[in-house]
Amino acid sequence: MKKQPSIFGGACIIASVCVGAGMLGLPTSGAGAWTIWSAVAICLTMVVMTLSGWLLLEAYSTYDLRASFSTVTKDMLGSTINAINNLAVYFVGGILLYAYTTASGGIIENLIKPWIDLGSSGLAICSTIFVLVFSYFVWHSTRIVDRISVLLIVFMGITFVISIYGLAANISLDTLFDIGGKEGDYAKYAIGMFPVALTSFGYHHSVSSMRAYYGEEQKAKYAILGGTGIALTLYLIWVFVIFGNLPRDQFAPIWESDGNLDVLLNSLGNVIESNTVKQMINAFSIAAILSSFIGVGLGVFDYLADFFKFDDSKIGRTKSWIVTFFPPLIMSILFPLGFLKAIGYAGAVATIWTCIIPALLVYKSRKRHNTTEFRVGGGNGLIIFTVLFGVFVAIVHFLAMFNYLPSFKG
């Protein structure tokens, strides 16, 4: 009898998709809102993103287990909406892979620079090596991604605990709550945090993979909840210990670099005395990027395989691998962009397929099928709220992009 996949394994895949972006982007994007309001924004986003993932599961439940986001959207909403959704999914998945590739190349280059100086080509070389080595797991199979994700989550857990222990020992409550800060109006900055927070829970392109993996909706539902729950817990602890160590006004150079990870790590290193803690934070950050790179890569890989109708043979998977990983790598080499800026763009576009499309799919599905075995509670109220949340986040990003929202610069 074939062994059933564990819910924990699926939760680790979902968490691994989420954690990279959040760990790297949330502290900087939340610097204006600071501790309390950052926590409010992160928690609200987690709840909405979990429910919208469940809405997708409900929409999928009347289709074959191999049916993908693209297949269901085309059948329910038509070719035009599906084309828009396809572009949005690929844009977000691609820009996340691009951001992780660029960030990883920069970290690897800095790590080896004391021994090997690759000069002006260092970032491109390190980014290419990173992609060629770690995209292999996605090419191989979902099962190996499951196993690697579990190993990475365990490794992240160990390095996270050591990092948090070291950082927590030096937390200053005055720093954590910005006592005596020059500016005490935090709430106005919380709105601008939502695009990054939404991207931090953007696992939805992996929902069809989870359903196919388990062969049912109920286990996939719990895997999604477990994954977003793991991500939320890690995010809150991570943000709190960073805000408790790194004063609010010291985020200025991080903002100036558009939230680049190496600048954040260097800033943290300047306030941490223990070399062991510094090394653990670096190791944790690399594992967070790698886990998210693999998780996002799996979702985009399966999505494009269905879109282009590539089969599951080695040749077919190689074609899927090329269209998944090569375009982001080429863009990373030619146009390296600030990490936080890239994540913000991803968040704005992700509202289409994390909020708006799932709600519309369920609305159409319920009109077509009066009853289904798997059904999310909340009625039309949840559908409307999910759409409004997505529209709100998209508007926030574009207002911030044109400087119509308060922007904290340290």
Segments (PLM) and residue ranges:
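Transmembrane alpha-helical segments of multi-pass small-molecule transport proteins
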Residues: 9-18, 86, 111-141, 155-163, ...
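TM-loop-TM module centered on a large, flexible mid-protein loop between adjacent transmembrane helices
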Residues: 64-79, 229-289, 310
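Helix-loop-helix junctions that connect adjacent transmembrane segments
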Residues: 116-129, 140-143, 150-266, 405, ...
